[in-house]
Amino acid sequence: MSVYPECTWLLFVCLCHLLVSAGGSLLLPCEPINETISVEKDGCPKCLVFQTSICSGHCITKDPSYKSPLSTVYQRVCTYRDVRYETVRLPDCRPGVDPHVTFPVALSCDCNLCTMDTSDCAIQSLRPDFCMSQRASLPA
């Protein structure tokens, strides 16, 4: 038996390990990024589109092969750690409608459990700049 098949197998295993290690470092970490978002509300005919900081990136998760009905699996997602709140004014709102909308600005992010009260935890959601009504932009 030749020594080459064993060396080939060892080389294959080493290359697979390197590719897996490199692949993990190519994923973007969970951190604040600049993103175009939109805000709108009932009684205001225009959707306001602007840039802000949101949390985005990869969090290491584990999904067990065996899922026991007695245990709970917790998946970590990239979510806000520290935030600052800013307020914008929507244009052309009807009389009696408060034109102000307050939104979080990401100062730092963390891989943590998804909080449904403050985050969109859907598997697939709308783009952050999706508008149902006519678009308007913040003045430069």
Curated annotation (Swiss-Prot):
Compartment(s): Secreted
An annotated Gene Ontology molecular function: hormone activity
GO biological process terms on file: G protein-coupled receptor signaling pathway
Coiled coil: none
Keyword set includes Glycoprotein: yes
Keyword Secreted belongs to the record: yes
InterPro entries: Cystine-knot_cytokine, Glyco_hormone_CN, Gonadotropin_bsu, Gonadotropin_bsu_CS
One Pfam family of this chain: Cys_knot
Main localization category: secreted
One GO cellular component, as annotated: extracellular space
Cysteine pairings via disulfide bonds: C30-C78, C44-C93, C47-C131, C55-C109, C59-C111, C114-C121
Cited function: Involved in gametogenesis and steroidogenesis.
Stated name of the protein: Gonadotropin subunit beta-2
Originating species: Anguilla anguilla (European freshwater eel)
